[in-house]
Amino acid sequence: MGNNEEYFIDVNDLSIDVFDVVEQGGAVTALTADHGMPEVGASTNCFCYICCSCSSN
């Protein structure tokens, strides 16, 4: 195998997008889902982690 750069593609050049995948029944997951700082509620829907009783569960 030669240079790895020959295998890189630009995702903008792909002929399908996330909406096409979903319409065809495919599952789409965000790479950032559930990543954050649970100790301060960053992965919750709580907007005021200091004053509310939201949990990260």
UniProtKB/Swiss-Prot annotation:
Crosslink site(s) for Thiazole-4-carboxylic acid (Asn-Cys)?
Answer: 45-46
List modified residues, type 5-hydroxy-3-methylproline (Ile): 50
Q: Which domain of life is it from?
A: Bacteria
Q: What does the PTM comment state?
A: Maturation of thiazole and oxazole containing antibiotics involves the enzymatic condensation of a Cys, Ser or Thr with the alpha-carbonyl of the preceding amino acid to form a thioether or ether bond, then dehydration to form a double bond with the alpha-amino nitrogen. Thiazoline or oxazoline ring are dehydrogenated to form thiazole or oxazole rings.
Q: Where in the cell is it found?
A: Secreted
Using the UniProt entry, state the residues involved in the cross-link Thiazole-4-carboxylic acid (Ile-Cys), renumbered to this chain: 50-51
Question: What's the protein name?
Answer: Thiocillin GE37468
**Propiece residue ranges:** 1-42, 57
Cite the location of the cross-link Thiazoline-4-carboxylic acid (Phe-Cys) from the record.
Answer: 47-48
Instruction: Kindly list the GO CC terms recorded for this protein.
Output: extracellular region
